[in-house]
Amino acid sequence: MSAAENRALVERWYRALENNDFDAIFEMHHDDVIYNMVGNTLVSGRIYGKDACCNGMIGEKLLEKLIPEEIRFATSWKIIAAEGNRVVGLMQGGGPTKSGEMYDQTYCEIFTIEDGKIKEMHAFFDTVLVEQCLFDNTLSTPEQPLADPFQIN
C-alpha cells in the first residue's frame, strides 16, 4: 500500500473512534497486531494479538472504567506524518469515568501498516492521568523531612 492509502486507513480508524465503532476498529487490525503502550500502568506494556489488543486492552481495561454512552476517544485528531508503511497521529478524547473523574487524554500514536491492516501501534499518553482517573491511584508520596536542607551529599 502507498503512504496515502496507509494514511487513509488511520483516518478511518480515528473516525471509527469518534463514533465508538469498535467493530470497525477490530476489523482494521491485523490478526497478529502488537500494541506498545508507554509506561508502567495497568494498560501499559506490549500486547499481542487482535483479541488481546481490541477486546482485552480497549474493551476490558479501558471501557470498563468509563461510562460507555459518554466516552469519545477521538474528539479531535490529526495525522502528523505518513511515510512508507508508517503513520503518526495525535488524538484527544475521553469522558467521564465510573468513579466520577474526567478522563481527557492526549495520545501520540505511531502505526505500522501491513497488508492493509494495522500491524503495530506505539501509543504515548499521560500515564499519571491513567493512574489517577482510571485506577484511583493518587500517586502521593509521603513527605520526608530533611535533616539539614542545606546539606549536599
PLM features: residue spans?
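A beta-strand edge to alpha-helix "cap/lid" segment located at domain peripheries
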Residues: 2-5, 61-153
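Short, aromatic-enriched amphipathic alpha-helices that serve as compact interaction elements
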Residues: 3-21, 28
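Hydrophobic pocket/interface hotspot
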Residues: 10-13, 25-26, 33, 53, ...
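A solvent-exposed, acidic/Ser-Thr-rich amphipathic alpha-helical stretch
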Residues: 30-86
